[in-house]
Amino acid sequence: MDKDLWAKMHGATVHFPIALVLFSFTLDGAGYAFSKLAMRRGLHSAGYWSMLLGAAGTVPAVVSGLVMTKGVLLGHDTLRVHHLFAWPTFALIVGIAIWRALGRGSTNERPSLGYVVAVGIAAVLVSATGYWGGEMVVGR
């Protein structure tokens, strides 16, 4: 078995939730800007599914990261900074997805402004998490 398998798995899985959370924020934010109902509904529906798929994608990313680090929850140096962003980001994204999935109305309804702000915070956190993960790979 490839000794770097879990590092490769982590690298392969982390990009989906990063992209989908950023995309969800962009879509729902854009949904607030459009006055045409059909356009708004399409954007909010895509934002809904992007968030749910992004949250689902966090699970293999977190599991592969934990296996790769042999269960180290914080670590030292850059790994510690990465994990200090990763754990709250993971919890926030899963919580936001549950909030959206259990919310009233259909998938294409306008989410609350509070929800969109929370997704914006998650987008910033997932970006910071990815940045510090990249710093470990680049080795700076």
Q: What name fits each language-model region?
A:
Residues 1-140:
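Polytopic transmembrane helical bundles with strong interfacial aromatic enrichment
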